[in-house]
Regions:
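N-terminal pre-catalytic "stem/leader" segment of glycosyltransferase-like enzymes
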Residues: 1-38
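A charged, aromatic-enriched C-terminal amphipathic alpha-helix characteristic of glycosyltransferases
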Residues: 4-9, 248, 252, 269-305, ...
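Conserved donor-binding/catalytic core segment of Leloir-type glycosyltransferases
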Residues: 111-128, 133-136, 146-147
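Donor nucleotide-sugar binding/catalytic pocket of nucleotide-sugar-dependent glycosyltransferases
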Residues: 71-85, 90-107
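Nucleotide-activated donor-binding/catalytic signature segment of Leloir-type glycosyltransferases, i.e.
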Residues: 160-186
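Acidic donor-binding loop of glycosyltransferase active sites
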Residues: 196-210, 223
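Short hydrophobic beta-strand element within catalytic cores of glycosyltransferases
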Residues: 224-227, 234
Length: 311
């Protein structure tokens, strides 16, 4: 299969929600400069979703003369823009932030006291699965279980074949834990369809996210989120999750995550958290729906096209 990570999924949504007559006038390259050739007859855009510290970006961004190759730079978060501005002095007057979006806003699950507490984790395995599995080993309540969809398959067959062996010990550890169900890769459509089967999305990240599509999918579905404040997570998730403070001491972070899970499980049935989750869904529907993102993109693209071809 071809890659279908957040970058590919957001590009699919862009083409679904933004008129073709606008997109035909621009050339959008995602994240890695040069992946798509520059077209002198179009507005050339680098849609940057990768982090500033990725080795394959240094050659381009470290050479300020090369910044002129693109007409515009679009970043998926203010956090990401600020990092590129700070480390590479990118052209500020040709940079825009348009965050990722979602179109999945299902009727959320209402948790009732005594129901099983179901957790979901559907991030790639190098982003914090080790910490989460350590946290699950501390949880003794048999009513709390975790389903893990973590896999390298999301980035395609070639990526999986080259990298998956590194993470097989983690998969095996997950399979052996009594309160963890290791499921592995499922298409994004499956994840979205089943998101409301879950009560919490738990993500103790050890990877600097520039956004976090997995968290957005959970938040928009009314799922309670437990995460940390590493990278752009606090921007994507705003004030809605339970935050565990990031630390390089993974043992401490696992312990704090386990405590947060147990505490959250104890209040999921309370009226205050039900109201909280209702408001959470409203927030993400208002600010992160693809109806809104399409408006942002169309406004930007019209201006960029007019500037280049009508000047």
């Amino acid at each position: 299969m071809d890659p279908r990570g957040a970058t590919e999924l957001q590009m699919e949504m862009l083409h679904k929600h933004v008129p073709k007559e606008l997109l035909d006038k621009v050339q959008i390259c995602t994240s890695v400069p040069g992946k798509v050739p520059i077209d002198p007859n179009k507005v050339n855009i680098l849609w940057q979703k990768n982090s500033y510290d990725q080795p394959n970006l240094l050659e381009f961004f470290g050479n300020k003369e090369r910044h002129k190759e693109y007409d515009w730079y679009i970043f998926n978060s203010h956090w990401n823009y600020e990092k590129f501005r700070y480390f590479f002095n990118i052209p500020e007057d040709r940079s825009v932030v348009i965050k990722n979006g979602t179109s999945n806003f299902p009727k959320r699950k209402i948790y009732k006291k005594g129901d099983p507490v179901k957790l979901i984790h559907h991030c790639t395995p190098w982003r914090g699965l080790n910490v989460l599995l350590a946290a699950m080993q501390e949880i003794k309540d048999p009513n709390i279980t975790l389903d893990v969809y973590s896999s390298t398959q999301v980035y395609g067959d070639a990526f999986k074949n080259a990298n998956d062996d590194e993470f097989k010990p983690l998969y095996e550890q997950a399979k052996k834990l009594p309160n963890v169900n290791y499921i592995g890769y499922k298409p994004n459509e499956y994840i979205l369809e089943h998101m409301t089967d879950y009560d919490m999305f738990v993500y103790p990240s050890v990877f600097e996210e520039t956004f976090c599509a997995s968290a957005l999918e959970a938040l928009a579905s009314g799922v309670h989120v437990i995460t940390n404040n590493f990278g752009a997570l606090y921007e994507t998730c705003a004030e809605w999750p339970v935050y565990v403070n990031y630390t390089e001491n993974h043992r401490n972070m696992a312990h704090a995550t386990a405590s947060a899970i147990v505490t959250a499980a104890s209040y999921l049935h309370e009226d205050f958290i039900q109201e909280h989750l209702d408001e959470q869904v409203k927030f993400y529907k208002r600010f992160y729906s693809w109806n809104k993102k399409a408006m942002e993109w169309q406004s930007f693209l019209k201006g960029a096209i007019d500037e280049k071809f009508k000047a």
